[in-house]
Amino acid sequence: MSLHRLRGRHLLWLADYTGEEIRHMVELTLEMKRRYYAGERVIPVLRGRSVGLLFEKPSTRTRISLEVAVAQLGGHTVYMTPSETQLGRGETVADTARVLSRYLDAIVARVRSHKTLEEMARHASIPVINGLSDLTHPLQAIADMATILEKKGRLEGVKLAFVGDGADNVLHSLLLAGSKLGLHITVATPPQIRPDERILSIALKAAEESGGSVEIVSDPYEAVRGADVVYTDVWVSMGQESMAEEKVQLLKPYQVNAKLMEATGGRAIFMHCLPAKRGQEVTDEVIDGPWSAVWDQAENRLHAHKAVLSLLVP
């Protein structure tokens, strides 16, 4: 695959990328990690480059790992929130994108609405990269696929069980990535909460082509039987506080605890994109226990960001 095909492209969601391109990002993530631990703390492919971080929503992992990633690639970051820019005073997303394109080499945007990303990409002349939206979280999915490859030695044929909120943005990106990479994904979620239908349709078609599968069930124990990976996320995301009580009651049977992990048959790892609401979607004994790959997964965000930025930033 020619790397020039990726240079300068937006990354709004993984539906725009082939399985081969996603796999290359995943493998480069682990290569970046190997080089880091071999002593290459700086790989200066972004020397002289500036990456803007435009965040409507606060972050620990995304912001810090991106700032460190750009530094380890020899570039530098400019962090912005709407209140610190004219976006907070009514300047349009389109005008902001045009202006930032004159100063920066790429924009990573963490936004409340996916439509904001799409509008930014329409008017920017530099890559716009999704650092999280209400619909998807592609950078997280790249790190997650790298973690699975690192822990299981393969992606094709891996059984991933996602237990919890079926409309979760991270799940959407796991569906888009995993279906193109040959994973067997089972989502256990209440019938009232389903993945975005457009994303589900794309994932089902991609799974047919890759030899993977996608299934939606309501029983968490059915989902995790024989699973290689059990994955969950918070039940109430930022901006959903008004529906917190109703959602928590609905999702209580979907808590990942030791009993559920033992039902996998003993070979599964546990993954969570963090932050975790301990005692809600996952218990301490799971996230801190022998199943947990969460801390390696969190570290791999750093290396995934290096991989993606090194491929996309011109």
Curated annotation (Swiss-Prot):
Family per similarity comment: Belongs to the aspartate/ornithine carbamoyltransferase superfamily. OTCase family.
GO MF terms held by the record: amino acid binding; ornithine carbamoyltransferase activity
PANTHER family referenced in this protein's UniProt entry, alphabetically: ORNITHINE CARBAMOYLTRANSFERASE, MITOCHONDRIAL (PTHR45753), ORNITHINE TRANSCARBAMYLASE, MITOCHONDRIAL (PTHR45753:SF3)
GO biological process, one term: citrulline biosynthetic process
Superkingdom in the source lineage: Archaea
Recorded catalytic activity of this chain's protein: carbamoyl phosphate + L-ornithine = L-citrulline + phosphate + H(+)
Alphabetical keyword list: Amino-acid biosynthesis, Arginine biosynthesis, Cytoplasm, Transferase
PROSITE patterns reported in the protein's UniProt record: CARBAMOYLTRANSFERASE
Annotated compartments: Cytoplasm
Function: Reversibly catalyzes the transfer of the carbamoyl group from carbamoyl phosphate (CP) to the N(epsilon) atom of ornithine (ORN) to produce L-citrulline.
Chief location of this protein within or outside the cell: cytoplasm
Residues that coordinate or bind carbamoyl phosphate: 59-62, 86, 110, 137-140, 273-274, 301
Stated name of the protein: Ornithine carbamoyltransferase
